[in-house]
């Protein structure tokens, strides 16, 4: 009996030991043989190779097991390092080859520092890299051909360095590149065919070929081997002097011609009253002068204000060609450097989808940062749900489901199809606009990150509206695609109830957080009571239950329990098919309408609630 008991105890200890060992092995998947997180070791090597006079890397500690809390380091929900945003930090030294060990990296921004030495070829090991910006440094040597192995690379900027040699064919031929900037280096040789949709190679005097507009020549310089006699040499000198004199005369005549042409051109400009600031275009984006924006908005007249929120004031504007636009005048422009602002604007401009608000252009001065969008005549979903639009059509049940579908399509594009991927971080009814056909247009994407440049860490500033912010984002500052899924679930509830996420009323149910109120009604099978009274009972009971179930699934407290937006989209597409199949008008269901007595509060920024379209 004692022997059997001893065997049983030994077997239990053995099972416990190996279960603990398995757990430790799982935890050690990120550890090196010395017990140090390999990403920590790689980041420390990057730090040690750099000179950090501003001590922005002082928080990077070799004894730390989690680099996700470090400045300028962004991580995925699984804990892998996916972004290093170290632009304009006064860093010098070299870029360590250990950068190639951060194999989950999606974004690497090191522009506007003073880094020297070659660009590490180990960057070619970052198979998931989508955005690489090393511009405005002093990198020398050749462009590593290994960058051509980065098949996910969408944005590559190496401008304003000291790079030499030829442009690698592998890099030029990257089919996924949307933007390539190699301007203002010392590159030479023939320029290969460049696959990027938008590229720049100006400022490389020794580049030749069609892309550089300089012809390549295979001719070699002819050496001087004339062997002339002194008499012939004298005649030769006379010819040279005559030729030089002719060149000088021609040069003087050319200067006189140029002088008179400038006078004529200036008078022509004066007569046509063309007085515009310097402007240029970035791809399809137009850069407006400040004077143009002033004129379009009647000098930022209060009569043209469409709304005000955490990102700044929004004005209605009229361009000379009759186009109506919405101008977003960003707050605190001094915190975003011109190059950084231009980089972020280019990334936002690359996101083009029928359910996304297209960026039309921008304005950038030392004191101002403004974004120009098409004007949405039907305002936002929040406007339609809560404001009186007179005789304009209201949002019926089918239209609300269709709006949810359109918004989902826009978010799926941002999360899974846009390159680089974009997390919205403030999905709500006020940021879903309606075009002429009442199709949902997702607005304000990319702006939270654009204004986070003042922060040293990619996610230190929590941006969003109380009630719409996912719990993990609010508590840790770490955002992911699941953060937007939470906000989308809240949007569905806003469409169903017609109320803000944080609302108070005087009915039998006094609502604070709409989410908890809906959960209570759902548990009690009282679905009809949560429906907006403006629908007058005309809604589909079965679709309502499924939509509520979907919204509550999207707003699960833990991000891993929430579906991906692509999964949400599939469910909504099925529900839209049911709605399009039609439904008979039902007797008005019991619904309670509560007054919007309190405005939404905001965390760090105010809620962007616009009284008119943006």
From Swiss-Prot:
The chain crosses the membrane at residues 243-263. ATP binds at residues 306-314, 328. It is found in: Membrane. It is a single-pass type I membrane protein. SMART domains: S_TKc. The modification Phosphothreonine is found at residues 297, 323, 459-460, 465, 476, 555. Its EC number is 2.7.11.1. Residues 264-614 are cytoplasmic. LRR repeats lie at residues 104-126, 128-151, 152-174, 176-197. It is an enzyme of class 2 (transferase). The modification Phosphotyrosine is found at residue 473. Its main location: membrane. Residues 300-576 form the Protein kinase domain. GO terms for cellular component: membrane. Glycans are attached at residues 186, 193, 224. GO terms for molecular function: ATP binding; coreceptor activity; protein serine kinase activity; protein serine/threonine kinase activity. It comes from the Eukaryota. This is Probable LRR receptor-like serine/threonine-protein kinase At5g45780. It comes from Arabidopsis thaliana.
